[in-house]
Amino acid sequence: MSGENRAVVPIESNPEVFTNFAHKLGLKNEWAYFDIYSLTEPELLAFLPRPVKAIVLLFPINEDRKSSTSQQITSSYDVIWFKQSVKNACGLYAILHSLSNNQSLLEPGSDLDNFLKSQSDTSSSKNRFDDVTTDQFVLNVIKENVQTFSTGQSEAPEATADTNLHYITYVEENGGIFELDGRNLSGPLYLGKSDPTATDLIEQELVRVRVASYMENANEEDVLNFAMLGLGPNWE
């Protein structure tokens, strides 16, 4: 992938597509992605696989979002963050953020497991994966899985197409809740301390409030463009 053509087809917000890609990277078969239709309605939450280990949000970017990407972590938590270096690859980075911060879900010796272990002594104290080695790893993943990007139920756009839809990830790490966005050059965003009474990530009020803020700030025509995926036990 040349410097002039560092772009991929955007991944469809589809649990099967995300799960297939994650399994290729090393996610154990006992875990999978699934649709989340609400963070607050009990009747919809009751049918979700639990515990939820990560939440991926697809949302339309507006001017408010563009101006808020300078926020950064203000704590020493060991959350892992990848800088996005490939256009339209935010779905892949959402998967990387989900899995890298839940390494117990990875098969030992898998591609991502091996990469993270190889970097454990060389990455910075803030676990910022934004170096040349990381970039090459991501490019290799894309090369080996190029067909996966265009799978799904909808017609795939061109890799170089401009889109206003973007994926970010929420995880809990060492008692903190984080928003991970590869395009936020300041790194991971620390939302605050996790609620110790919550059974998993989907019950964390900080996540609910943050997602709600995106929906409230969206233009009326963009409200239907939101989607959420959760990472949890594979019920199939």
Curated annotation (Swiss-Prot):
Q: Which reaction does it catalyse?
A: Thiol-dependent hydrolysis of ester, thioester, amide, peptide and isopeptide bonds formed by the C-terminal Gly of ubiquitin (a 76-residue protein attached to proteins as an intracellular targeting signal)
Q: Active-site residues?
A: 90, 166
| Pfam families, sorted | Peptidase_C12 (PF01088)
The site annotation (Transition state stabilizer) covers 84
Cellular component, GO annotation = cytoplasm
Q: Which UniProt keywords apply?
A: Hydrolase, Protease, Thiol protease, Ubl conjugation pathway
Q: Which InterPro entries match?
A: Papain-like_cys_pep_sf, Peptidase_C12_UCH, Peptidase_C12_UCH_sf, UCH_AS
Region called Interaction with ubiquitin, residue ranges: 10-15, 149-157, 219-228
Give the Enzyme Commission number: 3.4.19.12
Thermal effects: Optimum temperature is 27 degrees Celsius.
Gene3D superfamilies the UniProt entry points to: Peptidase C12, ubiquitin carboxyl-terminal hydrolase (3.40.532.10)
Give site residues, Important for enzyme activity: 181
**UCH catalytic domain location, by residue?**
7-233
Q: Which GO terms describe its molecular function?
A: cysteine-type deubiquitinase activity
One GO biological process term: ubiquitin-dependent protein catabolic process
Provide the transmembrane region boundaries. none
Q: What PROSITE patterns does its record include?
A: UCH_1, UCH_DOMAIN
How is this protein's function tied to pH? Optimum pH is 8.5. Inactive at a pH below 6.5.
Q: What else is known?
A: Can hydrolyze human UBB(+1), a mutated form of ubiquitin which is not effectively degraded by the proteasome and is associated with neurogenerative disorders. It can do so despite of the fact that the C-terminal 'Gly-76' of ubiquitin has been substituted for a tyrosine in UBB(+1).
* Family (UniProt): Belongs to the peptidase C12 family.
Its biological purpose: Deubiquitinating enzyme (DUB) that controls levels of cellular ubiquitin through processing of ubiquitin precursors and ubiquitinated proteins. Thiol protease that recognizes and hydrolyzes a peptide bond at the C-terminal glycine of either ubiquitin or RUB1. Preferentially cleaves ubiquitin from peptides and small adducts.
What's the protein name? Ubiquitin carboxyl-terminal hydrolase YUH1
- Its source organism is Saccharomyces cerevisiae (strain ATCC 204508 / S288c) (Baker's yeast)
